[in-house]
């Protein structure tokens, strides 16, 4: 479970599609850094769970990184969900497809699905988040070296 939560620390926003042979950066191992895992969970809740679900993950598993039910409710849950519920979103997939061209994928198993001969899924996620670049030819104004022609903008850009 700690590995899944560590990956959440690295997944503040993702839309994945076809694979890539882009060389992967080595992701830092944060599996034993509870503060980093808690920050990652907060980033994931604030940035990713607006469009992406994590239906194989329940809010109460955040206890594994030292959060209380009260902290989970106050800082990571923004709907009427219960702490034992799965991490769903209210956006209808049909609306998402209309707005974005495709429904954003569920992120709960994305690290497993992105493991390849190039490296573990955590390395793909880490590389993906770090390789956005401006591309005025794209509808969002952004593209990605690890996932060319990505449909999602660089949501961590500030």
PLM regions: where:
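Electrostatic cytochrome c docking/interface patches
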Residues: 18-42, 53-64, 72
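Short strand-loop junctions, especially beta-strand C-caps/beta-turns
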Residues: 27, 110-112, 155
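Structured domain cores in non-transmembrane regions
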Residues: 62-110
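Short, conserved charged micro-motifs
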Residues: 67, 115-122
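Extracytoplasmic/lumenal ectodomains and periplasmic regions of secretory and membrane proteins
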Residues: 124-158
């Amino acid at each position: 479970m700690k590995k899944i939560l560590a990956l959440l620390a690295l997944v503040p926003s993702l839309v994945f599609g076809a694979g890539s042979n882009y060389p992967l950066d080595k992701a830092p191992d944060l599996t034993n850094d509870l503060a980093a895992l808690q920050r990652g969970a907060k980033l994931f809740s604030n940035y990713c769970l607006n469009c992406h679900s994590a239906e194989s993950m329940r809010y109460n598993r955040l206890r594994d990184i030292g959060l209380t039910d009260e902290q989970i409710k106050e800082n990571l849950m923004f709907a009427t969900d219960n702490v034992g519920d799965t991490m769903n979103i209210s956006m209808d997939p049909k609306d998402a497809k209309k707005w974005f061209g495709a429904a954003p994928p569920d992120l709960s198993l994305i690290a497993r699905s992105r493991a390849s001969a190039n490296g573990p899924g955590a390395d793909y996620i880490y590389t993906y988040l770090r390789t956005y670049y401006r591309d005025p030819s794209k509808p969002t104004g952004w593209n990605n070296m690890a996932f060319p022609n990505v449909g999602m903008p660089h949501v961590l850009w500030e």
